[in-house]
């Protein structure tokens, strides 16, 4: 194997060409620093996972919120964040707590203007994700905060990629695609470079799984290294090894992947071997509403349904999930409720009226109207009668969908695709009829219907997100639809511990000279800025905030 060597021709080496790496590089280029960006994938994958995202951004007290009559504040947002995070580890959460306060402050002040100055815009309706549903000081967003990027994930990538590519044209940035880092070089207690393998060239499209055939080696040196390599979302072995069984229940036997194959988590162990501290390994953020992509891009490609609150949710035994396990309310509590049955899937039961207004699909490619910034298509697909085209395509082609005119036919279809027990028609009918009877009055005792009524008091939900309450068994609202929901892997909430400048911390609590980390590999900041739970719209923001911190710190410190 040929080995290419390099003297420190760049100020900084960035490992990972995803969003966090691009943001850090952008900040360094603004300061006139030279950067060498390495990634094991090809140039087509510039932007990493962020490209595939819906582009949700967590803003606090934004103009969009105020126009919709939403009263938000730093204090309320921090209350929600800390109530969701539930930081309880003095050592592992030491920096995470500080990152949480700093990030919420960023979201309430600079974040929107920082992105707007780069050309990013958001849609006017603000979404209400992770609504919580328990107590004011517990998990969840008290108010809508999910701002959707006009252009979705590709636009978030674009606003940072364009200035970085301009830096490449100016000679400040070099890319080393198909360069897989296998080792951090440590000399005299400081990180001074990286070693790794050059992988064979490929022209595969973005997101496709690529080969790991080695054709050479490399060694590169710089004044500092930023690790921005992402999490473990497609590495099911690592997920199983770190799964929090005591907290969430048994690890699912069947998991489908919400991120591409290159999201392998390799750099976590490599950085730990070099001397960096990993904290909060057992904290993850996977989704309970995963469906198999009928038109996959990567292996085991999963899409998440981002649901409105009206679908009835049943476990694998056909028992309706209790409060607050309603669609879009409390991801980890619902995960625990599902897994305690001993099965790793659940069911939505809904109507055509609900799917038309309440089903959104995660992913830029599943929202071509917003991704393409096509206002006419957006109005047609979101306002016109019928579900958006991609949702209808899943209803017709998805292996997890059952459509029927009667409940008996629906249950028969559900039982054909069940991976566990056969559902009892009479019991399912009893539960649905009981719920439907509660609609006879404008008030009642069904917690989910109360939550729906609360949601529809918010204009954004009533106008575009929450269906008018109706009986599930009303033929006029049909046909009936059932969706088998799988566990979808996604985010690593723990990771490399970092201080507020994104410098990696060693196990003894001291800063690691020459080593920084940003994005998911650092738990989106500090080794776990979200604690145990996320409020959504915070993952892209965590990459941006931690990447910005790393870039700005090194721009100031390097001479």
Where are these regions (language model features)?
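N-terminal glycine-rich dinucleotide-binding loop that anchors FAD/FMN and/or NAD(P) in oxidoreductases
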Residues: 51-81
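Glycine-rich FAD pyrophosphate-binding loop
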Residues: 30-51
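Extreme N-terminal leader/targeting segments of oxidoreductases
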Residues: 1-12, 30, 529, 556-559
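Beta1/beta-strand and adjacent pyrophosphate-binding region of the FAD-binding site
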Residues: 5-20, 36
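Glycine-rich loop(s) and the adjacent beta-strand/alpha-helix scaffold that form part
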Residues: 202-294, 536, 540-549, 553
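A glycine-rich dinucleotide-binding beta-alpha-beta segment and adjacent secondary-structure elements
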Residues: 420-525, 529
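Conserved redox-cofactor binding core of oxidoreductases
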Residues: 99-218, 236-239, 291-292, 432-474
């Amino acid at each position: 194997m040929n080995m290419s060597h390099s003297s420190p021709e760049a100020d900084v080496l960035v490992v990972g060409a995803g969003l966090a790496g691009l943001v850090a590089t952008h900040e360094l280029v603004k300061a006139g620093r030279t950067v060498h960006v390495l990634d094991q994938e090809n140039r087509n994958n510039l932007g990493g996972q962020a490209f595939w995202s819906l582009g949700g951004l967590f803003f606090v007290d934004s103009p969009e919120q105020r126009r919709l009559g939403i009263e938000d504040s730093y204090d309320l947002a921090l209350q929600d964040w800390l109530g969701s995070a539930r930081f309880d580890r003095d050592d592992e959460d030491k920096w995470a707590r500080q990152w949480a306060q700093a990030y919420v402050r960023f979201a309430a002040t600079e974040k929107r203007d920082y992105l707007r100055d780069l050309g990013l815009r958001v849609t006017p309706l603000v979404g209400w994700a992770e609504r919580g549903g328990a107590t004011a000081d517990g998990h969840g967003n008290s108010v809508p905060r999910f701002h959707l990027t006009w252009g979705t994930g590709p636009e978030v990538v674009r606003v940072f990629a364009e200035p970085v590519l301009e830096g490449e044209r100016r000679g400040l940035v070099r890319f080393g695609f198909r360069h897989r880092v296998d080792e951090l070089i440590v000399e005299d207690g400081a990180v001074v470079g990286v070693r790794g393998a050059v992988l064979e060239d490929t022209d595969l499209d973005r997101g496709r799984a690529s080969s790991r055939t080695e054709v050479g080696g490399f060694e590169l040196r710089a004044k500092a290294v930023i690790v921005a390599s992402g999490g473990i979302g497609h590495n099911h072995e690592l997920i199983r090894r770190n799964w929090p069984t005591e907290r969430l229940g048994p690890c699912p036997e069947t998991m489908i992947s919400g991120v591409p194959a290159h999201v392998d988590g390799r750099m976590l162990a490599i950085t730990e071997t070099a001397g960096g501290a990993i904290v909060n390994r057992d904290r993850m953020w996977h989704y309970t509403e995963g469906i198999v992509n009928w038109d996959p891009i990567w292996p085991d490609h999963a899409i998440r349904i981002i649901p409105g609150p009206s679908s009835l949710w049943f476990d694998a035994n056909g028992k309706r999930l209790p409060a607050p396990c309603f669609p879009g309310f409390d991801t980890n509590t619902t995960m625990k409720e599902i897994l305690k049955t001993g099965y790793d899937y659940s069911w939505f039961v809904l109507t055509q009226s609900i799917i038309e207004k309440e089903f959104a699909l995660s992913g830029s490619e599943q929202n071509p109207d917003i991704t393409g910034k096509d206002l006419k298509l957006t109005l047609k697909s979101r306002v016109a009668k019928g579900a958006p085209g991609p949702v209808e395509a899943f209803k017709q082609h998805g292996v997890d969908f059952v459509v029927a005119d009667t409940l008996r036919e629906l249950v028969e279809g559900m039982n054909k695709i069940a991976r566990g027990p056969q559902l009892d028609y009479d019991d399912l009918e009893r539960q649905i009829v009981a719920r439907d009877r509660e609609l006879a009055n404008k008030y009642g005792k069904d917690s989910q219907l109360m939550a729906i009524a609360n949601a529809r008091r918010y204009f954004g939900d009533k106008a575009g997100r929450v269906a008018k309450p109706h009986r599930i068994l009303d033929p006029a609202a049909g046909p009936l639809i059932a969706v088998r929901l799988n566990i979808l892997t996604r985010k690593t909430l723990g990771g490399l511990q970092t201080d507020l400048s994104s410098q990696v911390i060693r196990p003894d609590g001291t800063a690691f000279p020459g080593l920084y980390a940003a994005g998911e590999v650092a738990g989106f900041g500090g080794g776990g800025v979200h604690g145990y739970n996320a409020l959504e719209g915070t993952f892209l923001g965590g990459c941006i905030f931690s990447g910005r911190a790393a870039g700005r710190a090194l721009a100031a410190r390097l001479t």
